[in-house]
């Protein structure tokens, strides 16, 4: 028999199964054999499978004649009772391997104890190796111990964890039963490690900056508010580390980066989570053109390092990170996708208002031409940018921390990287003129007083830092979660966060 229930019965029978397992645990407690902590694991499933993969060399006869023995531990994932000989599968962090369990090898008492184990229990086994008639490598078990009794049944193996919300809420179950989820999070770890390795090799210094700020800044976003009792002080969870990292550049740390969490009190979607991971870096004596080169090379090299290729499929689109990424001015992109809009109209507020009305784009009366241009870009261009594309030269109005262009007034030396219609990175030549920065902060304050929750606060200490002098600097922010989505082909940010934000269960 195989211990699995039809999906339709799982919910109905779960309480009964839990009660049955608790009864087994009670009996085990009476015997004093629960939750031991002295197991010595020496081998992993994937290593054993790889070492003895050659079927011609390692036949059942050669395996049983050899002196190879394994000591393994893992979760019991399947159990098939067949009289005096049974089969089972255990799973460890590396994979699965089959167990051959025979009463004449294991012993009658231990075999009887095995028969009452449940799928989900964690066990330790020892034994030699053999191969079944179907050619499957198996551990011929002669020692078996229960390490942890599982009181809740795992989802049915044929249907798995089909409730997406349950997968997110109970990630611990998802990781047990969904190999694809495990692989995503293993890749996530490798991606972050590859980013660090890439930057460290180029002499960037990894730093840590505060997670709680007196004044939220560094991004146009609504912050979470908290309170420090001892200091009697309202604080904000950071929306970005930017202003602290640039203070470090002022202090002479010319190449710095941070990979850490940001918090934004905004909506939840397939692309947004209130708590998310960002890579942010700054390099003195660098321009936004050089930062674009850096971002492009780092993303391409990370894909090659982790995936072994620069080609990925994301949400049905074939993405190639190998060729040079396209660079396209925002106003040119808007005009290309909206031929009725001329380049001259891109800085004409009244003309852009009429175009927004024609395109049925909702805007606020407080918007200047820069924010109106962005609104048209987001509605008509952004979703069309499938292959990697840098959208450059953003208006000053929407770029309060970026340096204004020397070539064209009203625009900045800024870029955003889009892949498959999603923003992956943002960067610019940093504004290092303290008087200009103070003026832009003041405009942000006026916007906030006018009802813009995402406008920035005035940070007087940051202005003071700039007054000591900051070298010409290029900065970059990469959404790590979205980069992981790209490199794992995931369509929702929740699929790449171990514990995404969810409403509390009722």
From Swiss-Prot:
Transmembrane segments: none annotated. Mg(2+) 1 binds at residues 416, 423. PROSITE patterns: AA_TRNA_LIGASE_II (PS50862). CDD domains: LysRS_core, LysRS_N. It catalyses: tRNA(Lys) + L-lysine + ATP = L-lysyl-tRNA(Lys) + AMP + diphosphate. Gene3D superfamilies: Bira Bifunctional Protein, Domain 2 (3.30.930.10), Nucleic acid-binding proteins (2.40.50.140). InterPro entries: Aa-tRNA-synt_II, aa-tRNA-synth_II, aa-tRNA-synth_II/BPL/LPL, Lys-tRNA-ligase_II, Lys-tRNA-ligase_II_N, Lys-tRNA-synth_II_C, NA-bd_OB-fold, NA-bd_OB_tRNA. Mg(2+) 2 binds at residue 423. It is an enzyme of class 6 (ligase). The keyword Ion transport does not apply. One of its GO terms (cellular component) is cytosol. Its main location: cytoplasm. Its EC number is 6.1.1.6. SUPFAM superfamilies: Class II aaRS and biotin synthetases, Nucleic acid-binding proteins. Keywords: Aminoacyl-tRNA synthetase, ATP-binding, Cytoplasm, Ligase, Magnesium, Metal-binding, Nucleotide-binding, Protein biosynthesis. Its cofactor is Mg(2+). It comes from the Bacteria. It is found in: Cytoplasm. NCBIfam families: lysS_bact, PRK00484.1. Belongs to the class-II aminoacyl-tRNA synthetase family. Homodimer. This is Lysine--tRNA ligase. The gene is lysS.
């Amino acid at each position: 028999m195989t211990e699995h229930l039809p999906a339709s019965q799982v919910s109905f029978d779960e309480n009964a199964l839990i009660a049955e397992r608790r009864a087994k645990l009670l009996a085990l407690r009476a015997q004093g054999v629960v939750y031991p902590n002295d197991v010595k694991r020496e081998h992993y499933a994937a290593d054993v499978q790889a070492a003895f993969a050659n079927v011609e060399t390692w036949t059942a006869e050669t395996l049983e004649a050899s002196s190879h023995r394994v000591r393994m531990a893992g979760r019991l994932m399947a159990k098939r009772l067949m009289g005096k000989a049974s089969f089972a599968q255990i799973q460890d962090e590396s994979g699965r391997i089959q167990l051959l369990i025979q009463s004449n090898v294991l012993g009658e008492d231990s075999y009887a104890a095995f028969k009452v184990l449940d799928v989900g229990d964690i066990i330790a086994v020892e034994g030699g190796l053999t191969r079944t008639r179907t050619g499957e490598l198996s551990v011929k078990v002669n020692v078996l111990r229960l390490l942890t009794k599982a009181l809740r049944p795992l989802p049915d193996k044929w249907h798995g964890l089909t409730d997406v919300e349950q997968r997110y809420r109970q990630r611990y179950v998802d990781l047990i039963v969904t190999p694809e989820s495990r692989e995503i999070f293993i890749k996530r770890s490798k991606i972050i490690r590859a980013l660090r390795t890439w930057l460290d090799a180029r002499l960037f210094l990894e730093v840590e900056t505060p997670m709680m700020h007196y004044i939220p800044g560094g991004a146009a976003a609504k912050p979470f508010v908290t309170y420090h009792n001892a200091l009697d002080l309202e604080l904000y969870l950071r929306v970005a580390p930017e202003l602290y990292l640039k203070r470090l550049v002022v202090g002479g740390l010319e190449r710095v980066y941070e990979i850490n969490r940001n918090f934004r009190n905004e909506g939840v979607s397939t692309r947004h989570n209130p708590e998310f991971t960002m890579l942010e870096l700054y390099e003195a004596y660098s321009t936004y053109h050089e930062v674009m080169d850096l971002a492009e090379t780092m993303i391409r090299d990370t894909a090659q390092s982790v995936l072994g290729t620069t080609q990925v499929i994301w949400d049905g689109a074939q993405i190639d990170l190998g060729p040079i990424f396209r660079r396209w001015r925002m106003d040119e992109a808007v005009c290309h996708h909206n031929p009725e809009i001329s380049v001259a109209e891109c800085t004409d507020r009244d003309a852009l208002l009429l175009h927004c009305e024609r395109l049925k784009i909702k805007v606020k009366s407080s918007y200047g031409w820069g924010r109106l241009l962005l609104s048209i870009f987001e509605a008509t261009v952004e979703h069309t940018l499938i292959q990697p594309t840098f959208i450059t030269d953003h208006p000053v109005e929407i770029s309060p921390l970026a340096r204004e262009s020397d070539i064209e007034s009203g625009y900045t030396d800024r870029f955003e990287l889009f892949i498959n219609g999603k923003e992956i990175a943002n960067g610019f030549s940093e504004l290092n003129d303290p008087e200009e920065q103070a003026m832009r902060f003041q405009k942000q304050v006026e916007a906030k007083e006018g009802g813009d929750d995402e406008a920035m606060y005035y940070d007087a200490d940051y202005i003071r830092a700039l007054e000591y002098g900051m070298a010409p600097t290029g900065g970059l922010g990469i959404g790590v979660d979205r980069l992981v989505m790209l490199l794992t082909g995931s369509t929702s940010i929740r699929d790449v966060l171990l514990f995404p934000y969810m409403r509390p269960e009722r």
